[in-house]
Each structure stands twice: as structure tokens, then as C-alpha cells.
Regions:
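Structured cytosolic domains appended to multi-pass membrane proteins
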Residues: 75-253
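Active-site nucleophile and cofactor-binding loops and adjacent substrate-binding regions
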Residues: 7-9, 34, 132
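Short, non-helical or kinked segments that cap or interrupt transmembrane helices
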Residues: 1-14, 25-29
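Membrane-embedded alpha-helical segments of transport systems
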Residues: 7-15, 38-42, 174
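Glycine/threonine-rich beta-strand-loop-alpha-helix active-site module
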Residues: 26, 30, 34, 192-195
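Membrane-interfacial segments at transmembrane helix termini in multi-pass membrane proteins
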Residues: 30-94
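Hydrophobic alpha-helical transmembrane segments
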Residues: 18-23
Length: 253
């Protein structure tokens, strides 16, 4: 979705430039060319981040008939629910917490609640970082904008390539509304429609807490084996409410 939006932005710029040529309006030509060029560059960069060609993305290469892979043995497909209290205990005694935001965070408008939770953890001496996937959300830079709105420090927001090696050394990764960008099938399942797409290595963290409303699939339309992982627990409900409940439990510790 972010790639398509940036592509539409590029096409809008080119349309404005074409209109400027028709009207002999230099300002429209220059502005349209700038918007078109920037949109084209951004589209290309994001397509590379997904390891997909732009035509494949536009043609609906995701979720349009791919097999919903499980990424492992289908014999054990149960999820392990958790509570706000248990999640708070896990994070309060962690060596580090990595927050992985996704579109669900944007829908719930949970960025301020997440910032409050992170502040509480930092006051307890627990470092908090944010792992940002380049195509998380519904537009380019979506997660960066939301977190900046909540006054999250820029240095705490880490790009995928900068943070991926840290998951293996992290006690808790908390996934808030992210799905496809954390799906290990992209790394492990050659038959998956997202195979080869770079992902955040959330599954390598010692424990994972996933905040979701339900078990529905993400934009790619496939299941996520991460949710059934041995070290993964699920906290179901509205992300903002769940994060606020975790924060209240942290205050009591």
C-alpha cells in the first residue's frame, strides 16, 4: 500500500507537469517535475525494500492467490493469550524492549499511549527502542510521523537494517498492530507470496508480545507463523486500551 500511494504521488506530479506544459505555466511544470521525481525515487526505494518490482506490486502480487503458508508444523497452531499484568512484568524486568509499530497502531491512535508506556519503562531503567520497517503502515514514513507526533526521540527510532541485529539480544519485542513486516515466512518459506521480502527479525527476540484485535491476516492475506511461536504471547484488544492497561500495571510494580 505505501508503494502504491507514493507511485500515485509521482503520477500526480507528472500530471501537473503535463498540465503546465499545456497551459504554458512554468511554475506548474517545475513543481510537477519536482513532485514527480521525488515520488518516483521514493517508490523505487520502497519497492526495493520489499524486494519486489513496481509492476508486480501494482498488479497485486501480494495476496492475490498466494498460498497462506504456516511456516512450520501445522500440528501445533495454538496461540498463547496473555494479560496486561503479565506483559508488564515481562517488560519491567527486561534488558531491553523493542517496540514494533504497524498499521494497527495508527488505527487505534495509540502512539501517545505507547510513548507513556516507554517513558514508564525508561524510568525503571529499561531501554526502549522502536523498530521501523520502511513499508509499515499505509503511506511512506507513516510510523515515523505518528511516533514523532507523540514526541518520541528521533534517536530511539531505528530503521530495519540498524535494529535487526539487536532482536537476538533483546528480552522483549512488543508488536503493536504490525503483521506482514514481521512474518518469518518471508525468510523461511519459498512458497510464500512474500518470500524474499526483508522483514524485522522479531522472531529472534527472547520473547514476543503481540497486540492485535484478532487473528486476521495482514495486507498480504497470509498467516503469520510468528503468532504461534514458542516465545510469543498475544494480547488481544484495542491497541490503545491494551497499552494503557500495561502502563497502569507498570506503575504498580
Amino acid at each position: 500500500m505505501p508503494v502504491v500511494i507514493s507511485l500515485l504521488n509521482a503520477m500526480t506530479g507528472l500530471s501537473a507537469a503535463a498540465a503546465g506544459l499545456a497551459l504554458n505555466n512554468t511554475a506548474m511544470i517545475v513543481a510537477g517535475m519536482i513532485v514527480g521525481a521525488s515520488g518516483s525515487i521514493l517508490t523505487n526505494l520502497m519497492a526495493k525494500a520489499m524486494n519486489r518490482s513496481i509492476p508486480a506490486i501494482v498488479a497485486g502480487g501480494f495476496g492475490g492467490g498466494g498460498v497462506a503458508v504456516s511456516g512450520g508444523d501445522d500440528g501445533d497452531r495454538t496461540v498463547k493469550p496473555t494479560s496486561a499484568a503479565d506483559a508488564a512484568i515481562q517488560m519491567a524486568y527486561a534488558n531491553q524492549v523493542i517496540v514494533v509499530p504497524g498499521y494497527g497502531l495508527a488505527v487505534a491512535q495509540a502512539q501517545h499511549a505507547v510513548k507513556d508506556m516507554a517513558t514508564m519503562l525508561e524510568n525503571k531503567g529499561v531501554p526502549v527502542k522502536y523498530a521501523i520497517h520502511p513499508v509499515a503502515g499505509r503511506m511512506p514514513g507513516h510510523m515515523n510521523v505518528l511516533l514523532a507526533e507523540a514526541d518520541v526521540e528521533y534517536d530511539a527510532m531505528k530503521e530495519m537494517d540498524d535494529i535487526n541485529d539487536e532482536f537476538g539480544r533483546t528480552d522483549v519485542a512488543i508488536v503493536i498492530g504490525a503483521n506482514d513486516v514481521t512474518n518469518p515466512a518471508a525468510r523461511n518459506e519459498p512458497n510464500s507470496p512474500i518470500y524474499g521480502m526483508p522483514i524485522l527479525n522479531v522472531d529472534k527476540a527472547r520473547s514476543v508480545i503481540v497486540l492485535k484485535r484478532s487473528m486476521n491476516s495482514g495486507f498480504a492475506g497470509i498467516d503469520n507463523p510468528l503468532f504461534y511461536g514458542e516465545g510469543t504471547t498475544m494480547l488481544f484488544g484495542d491497541a490503545k486500551k491494551s497499552v494503557s492497561e500495561v502502563t497502569e500495571e507498570l506503575k504498580a510494580l
